[in-house]
Amino acid sequence: MTEITAALVKELREKSGAGMMDCKKALIETNGDIEAAIDWLRAKGISKADKKSGRTAAEGLVAIAGAGHKAVVVELNSETDFVARNDAFQELVRGIAEVALSTDGTVEAISAATYPASGKPVADTIKDAIATIGENMTLRRAAKLEVEHGVVATYIHNAAGDGIGKLGVLVALKSVGDKAVLTSIGRQVAMHIAATNPLAIRAEEVDAAVAERERNVFIEQSRESGKPEAIIEKMVEGRMRKFFEEVALLSQAFVINPDLTVGAAIKEAEKTAGAAIEVVGMARLLLGEGVEKEEADFAAEVAAVAKG
């Protein structure tokens, strides 16, 4: 039987990223064969990852990659903020964003794409990271914007490092105007989107079901006034106009200069850019948005650990 030396364990640990005791056991099980031990650890790691995959991942990071005419934003969730501060996790989410640039920007396409550092699909690379880092992780959402002429401006809020943070925004500006001007106004609009979370770019693009729900609420509220139906209809129309102004990007008061709407601010920028500017897309990913975090019972958690 091959002697399992400290140097052999160290080599396996460096190659696999697994713990020392796991590496030693793997080498014993495979009679000191490094490659076989890596496979053994991978099998064990996949098993551990599968057990962890049922746990809620609501922390993590949002990452942005790209500039110029295209950019992507991705959300990689973890179970704890502690792991999100881990260098390996941060490198992983940045790498996934870079990979996403060469895809159509859907989670499915990104998951199937090859992660250069591992030579494996992104989905498998995440699974390996689950086994190594020890928490469930989920590539939850992604968005990609691209323009033939113009820029896709980006903004990260609460940045945890270069291109990573808790909130990421993309905004696509179609224009043949000056790129520096487009990038500047684009970043300002992206910051505005981060702050206000508009439902659509233009009023007519607001989801019909959302608008109808608001209209019904306004009708019921207005009827409580006891006024005639003709008056109620005018009241509702007025409130709907205000609603659209508040939720559509171009009609919102610009956070950088509240005296202007976003649309008016873009019109002003056109003078410097030397060409028309059209907002043709936006994406806003807030970390953990819509994910219900588990409220763990401490006593039950301790009992679960005690049971192994």
UniProtKB/Swiss-Prot annotation:
Keyword Cytoplasm: yes
Pfam families, per the entry: EF_TS (PF00889)
Keywords: Cytoplasm, Elongation factor, Protein biosynthesis
SUPFAM superfamilies to which the protein is assigned, alphabetical: Elongation factor Ts (EF-Ts), dimerisation domain (SSF54713), UBA-like (SSF46934)
CDD domains recorded: UBA_EF-Ts
Localization (cell): Cytoplasm
InterPro entries membership: EF-Ts_dimer_sf (IPR036402), Transl_elong_EFTs/EF1B (IPR001816), Transl_elong_EFTs/EF1B_dimer (IPR014039), Transl_elong_Ts_CS (IPR018101), UBA-like_sf (IPR009060)
GO cellular component: cytoplasm
Record-annotated disulphide pairs: none
GO molecular function, one term: translation elongation factor activity
Top-level lineage group: Bacteria
Predominant localisation class: cytoplasm
Location of the region described as Involved in Mg(2+) ion dislocation from EF-Tu in the Swiss-Prot/TrEMBL record: 80-83
Role according to the record: Associates with the EF-Tu.GDP complex and induces the exchange of GDP to GTP. It remains bound to the aminoacyl-tRNA.EF-Tu.GTP complex up to the GTP hydrolysis stage on the ribosome.
Similarity-based family: Belongs to the EF-Ts family.
Protein name per the record: Elongation factor Ts
Naturally occurring in which organism (per UniProt): Rhizobium rhizogenes (strain K84 / ATCC BAA-868)
